[in-house]
Amino acid sequence: MTTPSPTKKAALAEPKLFSGIFSLGTDAVEASAIIHIDSSGELVFKFSSIPYKAQSDFISAAWHDPSSDVVHFSFKAVAEDGARFETDHLFFSGLGMTSPEDAGTLLTPEARCAKGTLRYALKEPFPLPALRMRLKGFRNFGSLHAECALGRLEMNGPHEIDDEDDAADGWLVVQAAEPPPDDALWHDESEKLLEHVRRIMSFATASLLRVPIIEYIAGSESEVTVWFQTRQRSGVMPVFHFLAHDAIFAAAVGSYFSPPIVVKHLFFAIEWFAMEGTYNEIRLVNAMTALENLIDSNVEPSEALILPRAQFEKIRRVLLSVIRTCLGKWTAALANDASLELKEKLADLNRRSLLRKLELLAARWKVPLDGIDPASLKAAKQARDKVVHRGQYYEDARETDADLWTHVTIIREVAVRFLFTAIGYEGRYISHVGGYHDAVFPPAVKSAGETH
């Protein structure tokens, strides 16, 4: 792999003066700014003062507009060495106005950027294109490597315990092994591959690995696209230790090209699973939502319903007739209200419960649920329902009820096994059921008479 590794903790792009046009719609004015990318992957601007004249009045007008809408400016500029910057997503965080002697009024924008692009000329041609994501929050010991139809992949991150989560010092890169026949097609497919791997590794680390920068290096130019990102946080319950990412990385790459199961909305489930949770109530809801998303997105109609719709429709009509007969003894007003509500509820009678759909999907996908007590799974689902529908779990909990943390570990374990099956992973991982420990997927089937 010939792409250079990012410099850790330092600015990811050194300060450079760019001069060009600052605009909003048809209004425009000349402007200059020193721009760099800090260690977290954010574009940082230091604008030179702009004379306040009729031509630049649109800047002050936009800042003082009483509307709560964020105004996005454009800035297209060039540095002395030929580097180019452009954005249509610049917004103000402040606007300074000063009036020094003999200089008139000056405007000094303080700006941030939702998305911007830097383009640099390379000192030497780059014959084999490469696409690189800069990652926040990814820790690893050494480099992860894989080869595939699109080229060579490499993923890396720091391994120091005190490493800052928000630093964009991890990276994921793919480089073509030979010149692709269609550069644009290679770029698009490679971006999809990297995004797939990033999501799977987010699942592995139980943290949404953010990507503030994507760099495309090809021919004589490096194109660096930068996005504004929220602050990165480490996962509380990682599925893998950062020293043991090799097998899940291999599964992430392999499942892009040859998925063992065609899974709908896999990425939504992973985002819910890896979403930051500060309380056990939130962790339980997130894990259950990830599982529910997988189930409801992937069950067949025959698994979601108890009876075929046409067959149940006959039963529904009979039930409606019985309900009308019973309600005939009520006053007209009460009977009408009750009839409308009961009619809506009748459709629910034919829908299978979440846990039953879980059983059916697990059977079809062959997800091993060995060691998962059905009673514990039911209790965890009920705990989630309490949190969602009334906002708390413990108020009337009995001494015999499981602690909320136990429910979290059960639901997360089931979600982990579904996701492992979806990507074809086999190997060691971290399980929290019964306490933090190493486990193996798929779990070994115990022989008759074996107790542990």
Model-derived regions, located:
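Long, contiguous, compositionally biased segments that the model treats as domain-scale units
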Residues: M1-I200
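Short, charged N-terminal helix-start/capping segments
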Residues: P4-K16, L24-A28, L107-A111, R199-A218, ...
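Sequence-level detector for tyrosine residue identity
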Residues: Y52, F58, W63, F75, ...
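Short N-terminal signal/transit or membrane-insertion segments
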Residues: A79-M97, G219-Q229, Q311-C326
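Internal, Lys/Arg-enriched amphipathic helical interaction segments that engage polyanionic partners
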Residues: D183-V253
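Amphipathic, oligomerization/interface secondary-structure segments
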Residues: R233-H452
